[in-house]
Amino acid sequence: FFRWLDRGAPLTGDIRTRHIMRVTGAADGHVRHGMFLGTGAIMQATRFAHKTVHSRGLGGELSLGMVLVRSVWGLIRQDPKFYQPTHVAIAVQNGSGAEVTRDTAPMLILVASTLGRLFLGIRPFWAKDEAPIGLTAIQGGARRFARAFPSVLRGHPNRHVTVENGYESFGGARIELRFDGELNLDGELFATAGGDVPLVIETEGPIRFLRAK
């Protein structure tokens, strides 16, 4: 398909190749595609952004920074407006086909992406697995959160970021999440089918993108 497009309008310039996520298991049965997915506190942060920041006409990385600071402060204080863990079971198939599973547990923050770097230079994935999807899970009640989380954002976990303390990062080629609730996929909010139907995240691509200057 993309070769066909190139014959009529070849891409030139700063070309980047990226995988995208293919997501199934939504309540409406639709297949979706995106590069960033999150649930748990991501949902509370999204609602705060829509209600308090975007409604005032603020946008761009400045608004994202405001939302991040307010959300992290709410999580540190365990403010119930932001501190609402979502119970999720995880199954990750890595690049070699081996599967890692985690039983259902309250997840304070769960994010997945095919991008190594997110907005504001955030790099929340530190798994060593060679796989197209990064997945990071922070459990509800994660210890030393105020000291650990800044290093999580940088992708260079400090000594507080351990599985025992409630922090874990994976690399996967296929991910299954089982939970009843909502998630954010590139800004679109939707509900999972729940029950016995997993939310399945796979990859398509790589696809070429022309970077805007």
Enumerate the predicted regions with their spans.
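Catalytic core of DAGKc-family lipid kinases
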Residues: F1-P106
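Structured loops at beta-to-helix junctions and adjacent beta-edge loops in soluble globular domains
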Residues: T24, G38-T39, Q93, S113-L115, ...
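Short gly/pro-enriched beta-turn/loop segments at secondary-structure junctions
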Residues: D28-R32, Y83-H87, R102-L108, S113, ...
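Short N-terminal helix-initiation segments at or just after the protein's N-terminus
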Residues: H33, V72-F82, R117-R123, A142-L153
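Short, flexible coil/turn micro-motifs enriched in small/turn-prone residues
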Residues: H33-M35, I109, P150, E182
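Glycine-rich phosphate/pyrophosphate-binding beta-alpha loops
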Residues: G38, I42, I109-P124, N184, ...
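ATP/nucleoside-binding phosphotransfer catalytic cores, i.e., glycine-rich phosphate-binding loops
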Residues: N94-T104, G121-K213
